[in-house]
Regions:
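AMP-forming adenylation/ATP pyrophosphatase catalytic core
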Residues: 7, 119-362
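ATP-dependent adenylation/nucleotidyltransferase module used to activate substrates
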Residues: 1-151, 162, 170-173, 178, ...
Length: 362
């Protein structure tokens, strides 16, 4: 049982224990925070969270272990996060963490500990199609659904995953934690950027502290290509951004495109944010999914899905990785390269990948 020290994993563990499962709690130490660090609550590996995970295991009566995976987390999540922002992209570190760290490490530890299943506190489900094939699926509470971040789970992993909270709402889980008097029952929501902080100033400072001379200043251009300002680095911007641009045009303006090579940040009006076709890199699909096909596609966590066609798009330099082309039936707005696109069919996750580029309607 993966235990972060938060309310969700605590309730998930308690439910499994009530079912008579033989539970072993596992906490991954991924990042360092000094005791009492301001704002560390709700981030990964805050000292009090690791302590609460152990307290929950002790209260319920099952063993708990903490494993140090800080170096892996830095290489697989933190360094690519910084690199992406410096390249003018907007990364999705939670998807990267689940793919490259949490799932791989948890299944590795399950083998060591002799566990047949791996459980987490994610709001997601496992369902089967008419042929008995297992699929990751959206949680019943669509506002908390976390299937987006787990899109890259392999078929053999999905067969062994257990999501005790998949049919619950957050309010139900919170009430249960309080009634059980579980440690951390009153904790607030965890942050998506768990190792950085919630504000743009925090992530900008984080990236700059690790840039090592790679900051890319450049011009800010209006829709006509005229220079209307300058900036100190493309890492300060994301496609669709309106506030904090550092320029005043007398009309609403949004970041339309970021050219990391030249350092130019291109502005436009709201209509200029429309995108029709995406190139998806490092894509993964469930084994039984065939292309081309029509599916609903989500381009950012918390956004609604939109209908699109998906097909192979292998170029001459793509021999080592799978690339796909996604063409929306109606344009979608504010698509950021570096984010993840996830494909759904009636709530089932078909696959997904990193958005490499996004083209406007012709």
């Amino acid at each position: 049982m993966a235990m972060s020290g938060g309310v969700d994993s605590a309730v998930a563990a308690a439910r499994l224990f009530d079912e008579g499962r033989e539970v072993v709690g596992v906490t991954l130490h991924l990042w360092d925070y000094a005791e009492g660090t301001p704002g560390s609550h709700g981030r990964c590996c805050a000292p009090e969270d690791q302590y609460d995970a152990r307290r929950t295991a002790d209260l319920l009566g099952f063993p708990h272990y903490t494993f140090d995976r800080r170096e892996l987390f830095r290489k697989a999540v933190v360094d690519p996060f910084v690199d992406a922002y410096l390249a003018g992209e907007t990364p999705s570190p939670c998807a990267s963490c689940n793919r490259a760290v949490k799932l791989s490490v948890l299944f590795e530890l399950a083998s060591v500990l002799g566990a047949r299943k791996v459980a987490t506190g994610h709001y997601a489900r496992v369902v089967r199609d008419e042929f008995g094939h297992a699929y990751l699926a959206q949680g019943r509470d669509r506002r908390k659904d976390q299937s987006y971040f787990l899109y890259a789970a392999r078929g053999d992993e999905i067969e062994r995953l257990v999501f005790p909270l998949g049919d619950s709402s957050k309010s139900e889980v919170r009430a249960e934690a309080l009634s059980r008097r579980l440690p951390g029952a009153n904790k607030g929501e965890s942050q998506e950027l768990c190792f950085v902080g919630a504000t743009s100033a925090e992530y900008v400072s984080f990236v700059e502290s690790r840039a090592n001379g790679r900051l890319r200043p450049g011009p800010i251009l209006d829709a006509g290509g005229h220079t209307v300002g300058t900036h100190s680095g493309v890492h300060r911007f994301t496609v669709g951004q309106r506030k904090g641009l550092g320029v005043a045009l007398g009309r609403p303006a949004f970041v339309n495109r970021i050219d990391a090579a030249s350092g130019a940040v291109h502005l436009g009006d709201a209509d200029a944010l429309a995108r029709k076709r995406l190139r998806i890199e490092d894509a993964s699909l469930r084994e039984h999914v065939t292309l081309p096909r029509r599916a609903r596609v989500r381009v950012r966590h918390g956004h609604d899905e939109a209908w699109a066609s998906i097909e192979e798009d292998r170029g001459p330099n793509d021999a080592a990785r799978r690339t796909l082309a996604v063409t929306f039936e109606e344009p979608v707005r504010a698509v950021s390269p570096g984010q993840v696109a996830v494909f759904y069919d009636e709530g089932r996750v078909l696959g997904g990948g990193r958005i490499g580029s996004a083209e406007p309607p012709s």
